[in-house]
């Protein structure tokens, strides 16, 4: 069962357009919360990827963070591939032109 908190996170995440990324911090701010780690847990258990695009969530400094519970390896390579397919370039584990690619919720 998906919690009300997770449902809200997933709904917000689905509003992030292709070609953009957001952060755990931006998601938390949009929810009027400081629960960054809880949002990370919600991302790890995303039942509807890639329709709910958790690959678009990165760390506040533009580095990739994790993907599907992994910090490196094939899962993170998949995250890079998904982002690249959407026009987001990653170099050295960081989103290129991060400030321009960052999606901030209204």
Residue ranges and their predicted role:
Residues 1-106:
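Nucleic acid-binding interface residues in structured DNA/RNA-binding domains
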């Amino acid at each position: 069962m998906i919690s009300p908190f997770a449902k809200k996170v997933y709904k917000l995440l689905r509003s992030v357009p292709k070609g953009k990324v957001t952060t755990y911090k931006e998601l938390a701010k949009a929810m009027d919360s400081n629960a960054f780690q809880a949002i990370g847990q919600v991302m790890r258990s995303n039942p509807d990827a890639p329709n709910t695009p958790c690959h678009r969530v990165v760390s506040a400094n533009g580095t990739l963070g994790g993907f599907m519970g992994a910090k490196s390896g094939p899962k993170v390579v998949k995250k890079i591939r998904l982002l690249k397919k959407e026009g987001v370039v990653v170099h050295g584990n960081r989103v290129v032109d991060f400030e321009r690619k960052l999606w901030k919720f209204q």
